[in-house]
Amino acid sequence: MKDKAYDITIIGGGPIGLFAAFYAGLRGVTVKIIESLSELGGQPAILYPEKMIYDIPAYPSLTGVELTENLIKQLNRFEDRITICLKEEVLTFDKVKGGFSIRTNKAEHFSKAIIIACGNGAFAPRTLGLESEENFADHNLFYNVHQLDQFAGQKVVICGGGDSAVDWALALEDIAESVTVVHRRDAFRAHEHSVELLTTSTVNLLTPYVPKALKGIGNLAEKLVIQKVKEDEVLELELDSLIVSFGFSTSNKNLKNWNLDYKRSSITVSPLFQTSQEGIFAIGDAAAYNGKVDLIATGFGEAPTAVNQAINYIYPDRDNRVVHSTSLID
């Protein structure tokens, strides 16, 4: 069955893509968001969910999670016009009659215009690389933490030795029943002060050990098997939740296959965010132009212009005068 053609498809479900989708909904067009990750929010939600952001207009400070929650709440006003596709990576798109055919790793989509808001490319968590890991993912195996309270009273095992792993371990110390950190080296890569706090905490530290296997029933992991580096010693750690904090890898390899003009790793755009291909626009960190400032606030400002230009491209004969939101929403 052929997928219906949406007015605008937004590639990327980070802050800029979410706001662009909201604004497109405000303008009364249909929107599809295609996001490579299993959740919306992009880097703020994934890489620094609990860290404070200070340069969002009208917010003295808010966390990455709070920013994402606010954007999704704003977006939900137009949920009848917006479709969200998660865990889909855009491979190619081609001009077809009436718009574009967009091929992902899962499906083929159709859109009258495209707005690229994928930042520096698709990014994904670095995994343990163990058999059956995917089976436990998002059940009780996590690659990032949004709500610390979900681990209350649990036996939590954290794999990793960077800032996020150490920060989560310290934050969970007084929430979880127990916290164990497994790191492949004796030395941690986190901030010195954080490491000092960790070594004097009640967190169990197992170094240098590497994960070897996961055991569980159904979608729930129950034990992590670890082995001491360069030794035969093997331990089985009982757990209620496992947090893997190996960081994220980014890739813009597909972006380079989209037959657009590029400046380094970004897409060259006009002052109206038009790419070298008519009907395709780019905003946020994905877009390159002289004087560009790579801030979330900058991308928020770019989104309405790109959406309005996309609507002008799709419906050139329509009265496309921009109306303030105070006149559009009761």
UniProtKB/Swiss-Prot annotation:
Keyword Oxidoreductase: yes
GO molecular function, one term: NADP binding
The organism's place on the tree of life at top rank: Bacteria
A family per Pfam: Pyr_redox_2
Cofactor note: Binds 1 FAD per subunit.
Known catalytic reactions: 2 reduced [2Fe-2S]-[ferredoxin] + NADP(+) + H(+) = 2 oxidized [2Fe-2S]-[ferredoxin] + NADPH
Enzyme class (EC, first level): oxidoreductase
Annotated residues for binding of FAD: E35, Q43, Y48, V90, F123, D285, T326
EC number(s) on file: 1.18.1.2
Keywords: FAD, Flavoprotein, NADP, Oxidoreductase
InterPro entries: FAD/NAD-bd_sf, FAD/NAD-binding_dom, Fd--NADP_Rdtase_type_2, Ferredoxin-NADP_redctase_2
Cofactor: FAD
PANTHER family to which the protein is assigned, alphabetical: THIOREDOXIN REDUCTASE 1-RELATED-RELATED (PTHR48105)
Assembly, per entry: Homodimer.
Family designation: Belongs to the ferredoxin--NADP reductase type 2 family.
Protein name according to UniProt: Ferredoxin--NADP reductase
High-level lineage: Bacteria, Bacillati, Bacillota, Bacilli, Lactobacillales
